[in-house]
Curated annotation (Swiss-Prot):
Family that this chain belongs to: Belongs to the UPF0178 family.
InterPro entries assigned to the protein according to its UniProt record, in alphabetical order: UPF0178
Name this polypeptide is given: UPF0178 protein PputGB1_5282
Pfam name, any one: DUF188
Domain of life: Bacteria
Species, as recorded: Pseudomonas putida (strain GB-1)
Length: 150
């Protein structure tokens, strides 16, 4: 079992939760980033820094993650590529990406991108608080249990 993290966009609190789960359940964590990020000092955690470039980390994740593994990412187009490949994907707020919801998630992402470009809505998501951490922990637990049975 392996959990991949799109580390450039994943909150530290979510990364810490993943490592805590990994230590308890004995699975590998691979953090992929376009720049150096703090790597927890545990042997089960690897950090891969990819050459900078448009979507370099995304491309690496799609190329290396395989069905039966989980990728933590906020990027909806990346999640779509992973789901099409049969890889489980979860955002740091506890929302799982799957074939049933990808169309809606992509449409919402595209709409908000257009509205932001037109200046009609502000930037990103709200703060990453206790509610988000708890939702993420619950979803992570559920998905890891499901993938471990496969």
């Amino acid at each position: 079992m392996r959990v991949w993290i799109d580390a450039d966009a994943c909150p530290k609190a979510a990364r810490d939760l993943i490592v805590k789960f990994a230590l308890k359940r004995k699975f590998e964590v691979v953090m992929v980033a376009g720049q150096a990020v703090a790597k927890p000092a545990f042997a089960i955690v690897r950090l891969i820094v990819v050459p900078s470039g448009m979507d370099a980390a995304d491309d690496y994740l799609v190329e290396h993650a395989v069905p039966g593994e989980l990728v933590i990412c906020s990027d909806v187009p990346l999640a779509d590529r992973l789901v099409k490949k049969g890889v489980a994907a979860l955002d740091p707020r506890g929302r799982e990406f799957d074939e049933r919801n990808m169309g809606d998630r992509l449409a919402a992402r595209n709409l908000f991108t257009e509205l932001r470009e037109q200046g009609q809505v502000g930037g990103g998501q709200g703060a990453y608080g206790e509610r988000e951490k708890q939702a993420f922990a619950n979803a992570l637990d559920r998905i890891i249990a499901r993938l471990s049975k496969s």
